[in-house]
């Protein structure tokens, strides 16, 4: 008689923002009661997966739990899975980083509980066929993948096997929703299992009649807390002891005794339940991370940054100890939650760690400021990378704006903005509006894209030695399709940039328009539980105005924008950074805060700061505007000494 084996699995996720308090709370609600139950029920099997931060926490704060795990492992009741130490999306990493993170967690598990893992779990079940080689090289024999990532015809409650380039690894599908909280929880669970098996057996057998089958059940935290608090595992244990055809087991034990494996080939996949980018997004078209990054601009930007810093670290040769320190920061910054969540705090933490990795490499006294040109984000168009003493910036050819701005002191990306829909938000986004369009724009309403914000700029001049870049673009403006040309010049230095605009009317009619330069400064330390705002000051002649950044300028100035502005200063007092914009000619000015929500919660905040001029240009003529952009460190206020 064939037996159906049940393997219960708990696979928590980790992020770089996990605190000791959060891990302690999880221990008290999950691991402590579960450990007690398993110790008193030796016939009940359970499989754990611990990200790297969990293992480190137990070693420091709860060594008694690791001692208990050792005893449970010795009697073949518990198995601990391996994986990547910092829960990255594995297919995105270079081979050195893949193997390094896998080996790091395996070594930590072996040192902590005395046994090297043979099974593997990947964050978000993010899979690529090339991972077979990495997993086998690192000593893994099988991997768990969510059933939604596997072709339905292969889901027969049997282990699968996949080969790639001469190496093979077994795959155990992981299932959900096998239980309902009814009065007869245990009996209903057993009945549901039996019905599932009968349904599968009606399909016919592949190799032999009545093979043993395994159902790996993934328990999420709320369900596991409920099961433990109501002692539902105890009821299940009694049913399993009375039921001869259904038992609990471990994937490793089943692997040794099972002879049937179905062949499968999975090119790339991802567990869609981890995607938290947009509550209105249709995830049916997203079947891999590569499709995800094409759908969400913020994901692609962070992914490009991860690849770039990974390249810097892996190519560094001077100091092995420095390289290892930088690599540790790189691995922490590769955490997958920053890529799969709309939360700006998780993304900013990844940018922070990546900038710290680059900063470690820069401190070897061989760093030189540079301006380089290459395809940074793999879109087929060159970007311009500015590695200055105090910051890192990426200037995009499409739109000619700054799409990434990482400050070394603050180590966060101030250009981390969510897409506007029609154009990419960043710093020095160029618009040319009609009166009606600008009326909508200043009120935060849809106002088209201002033409130049989405136009590809062509390179006019590129000087690495002088850190100079000139871009040019041609567009058609208004209903009459007037031909206008905009030349944009960047002079890049250690503390900022000088940006020069030359707007030329190439049509045969006078050009009357509004030239607007929009800069979106992201909140790098945004906390939805305690929302804070940047400080904003404007100067006109000798008069200084302090603006309340919690609401738009129009709302607090009787629906009027500011005129004759000489300079604008937006300050992140918490990060100790200020940004100053000084036009060569007095400008008009509007400001408003922009927030993004997910499930009715604010997850991102940007401060939209726009300088604009009314322009009137005769045919064949041009005008010039220049903005001096400066990044400065704020002096921290010293508290008086108490004597």
List each language-model region with its residue ranges.
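Acidic-aromatic substrate-binding/catalytic surfaces of carbohydrate-active enzymes
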Residues: 24-25, 96, 100, 389-463, ...
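Active-site and substrate-binding clefts of carbohydrate-active enzymes
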Residues: 2-32, 39-41, 158-169, 176, ...
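Short, well-structured secondary-structure segments
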Residues: 3-94, 100-101, 118-122, 141-147, ...
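Active-site/ligand-binding surface loops and adjacent short beta/alpha elements
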Residues: 510-514, 520-591
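Beta-strand-rich recognition/accessory modules
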Residues: 370-375, 463-482, 496-498, 562-643
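Catalytic domains of cell-wall/extracellular-matrix polysaccharide-remodeling enzymes
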Residues: 100-157, 222-236
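CE4/NodB-like, metal-dependent polysaccharide N-deacetylase domain
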Residues: 97-124, 192-217
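Acidic (Asp/Glu-rich), glycine- and aromatic
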Residues: 406-407, 484, 492-539, 634-643
